[in-house]
Amino acid sequence: MRALITFALLCLLYITVQGKVSTPKVHVYSHFPGEYGKPNTLICYVSSFHPPDISIELLKNGQVMSDTKQTDLAFEKGWQFHLTKSVAFTPEKGDEYTCSVRHMKETKKFSWEPNM
């Protein structure tokens, strides 16, 4: 009987965790301060999301950038997840760099601000 109650509680916990949807928090930044014509690394850090149904793309002027690197999916306390995607780039005046994040069925874009 004790095992049955424990199993039921674990099932309830699993259903509760699986049913909770957390919208991702997104930060787009560069490794060094943005300077036009200077090599840098564009980084998109996505955190605090659940479930882990997510895809991240780095875009230059709306086109997917090649040679990107992505960390393995990792989880935080509360079964929320985080990922980082990055790419080497050299910002040029007039170019727009964005991070496109699709979580579940919703896609949002976040822009890199060079602060120049």
Curated annotation (Swiss-Prot):
The gene is b2m. It is found in: Secreted. Its main location: secreted. Residues 24-111 form the Ig-like C1-type domain. It comes from Danio rerio. It comes from the Eukaryota. This is Beta-2-microglobulin. One of its GO terms (cellular component) is late endosome membrane. One of its GO terms (biological process) is peptide antigen assembly with MHC class II protein complex. Disulfide bonds join C44-C99. SMART domains: IGc1. Pfam families: C1-set (PF07654). Heterodimer of an alpha chain and a beta chain. Beta-2-microglobulin is the beta-chain of major histocompatibility complex class I molecules. Component of the class I major histocompatibility complex (MHC). Involved in the presentation of peptide antigens to the immune system. Residues 1-19 form the signal peptide. InterPro entries: B2Microglobulin, Ig-like_dom, Ig-like_dom_sf, Ig-like_fold, Ig/MHC_CS, Ig_C1-set, MHC/Immunoglobulin. One of its GO terms (molecular function) is MHC class II protein complex binding. Gene3D superfamilies: Immunoglobulins (2.60.40.10). Keywords: Disulfide bond, Immunity, Immunoglobulin domain, MHC I, Secreted, Signal. Belongs to the beta-2-microglobulin family. The lineage of its organism: Eukaryota, Metazoa, Chordata, Craniata, Vertebrata.
